[in-house]
């Protein structure tokens, strides 16, 4: 019931995908898994919370890690794990 929608924005203010999550961080992790950022060169993810003027700005990257020991059969041995780091919140005018 308290799922929030976050819209992915680019530098020009175009809005692309919608990621859902209870927290902005949860949505950012989903977005990070689609990106191509690395720890040395992270992506910048800008998520606008739908219905608000707040844009959550994250640095995002993913690393290839070993899958957990108890992974389901369909999961490969190496998985990409997303990381996000909150930078700031911007207010839209």
Curated annotation (Swiss-Prot):
<feature type="region of interest" description="Disordered">
    <location>
        <begin position="1"/>
        <end position="44"/>
    </location>
</feature>
<dbReference type="GO" id="GO:0003677">
    <property type="term" value="F:DNA binding"/>
</dbReference>
<dbReference type="GO" id="GO:0042262">
    <property type="term" value="P:DNA protection"/>
</dbReference>
<dbReference type="InterPro" id="IPR036620">
    <property type="entry name" value="MC1_sf"/>
</dbReference>
<dbReference type="Pfam" id="PF05854">
    <property type="entry name" value="MC1"/>
</dbReference>
<protein>
    <recommendedName>
        <fullName>Chromosomal protein MC1</fullName>
    </recommendedName>
</protein>
<dbReference type="InterPro" id="IPR008674">
    <property type="entry name" value="MC1"/>
</dbReference>
<keyword id="KW-0238">DNA-binding</keyword>
<comment type="function">
    <text>Protects DNA against thermal denaturation and modulates transcription.</text>
</comment>
């Amino acid at each position: 019931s308290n799922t929030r929608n976050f819209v992915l924005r680019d530098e020009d203010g175009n809005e692309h995908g919608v990621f859902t999550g209870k927290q902005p961080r949860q949505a950012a992790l989903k977005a990070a898994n689609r990106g191509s950022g690395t720890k040395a060169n992270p992506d910048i993810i800008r998520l606008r919370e739908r219905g608000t003027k707040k844009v959550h700005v994250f640095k995002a990257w993913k690393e290839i890690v070993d899958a957990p020991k108890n992974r389901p059969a369909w999961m490969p041995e190496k998985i990409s794990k997303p990381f996000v780091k909150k930078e700031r919140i911007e207010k839209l005018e």
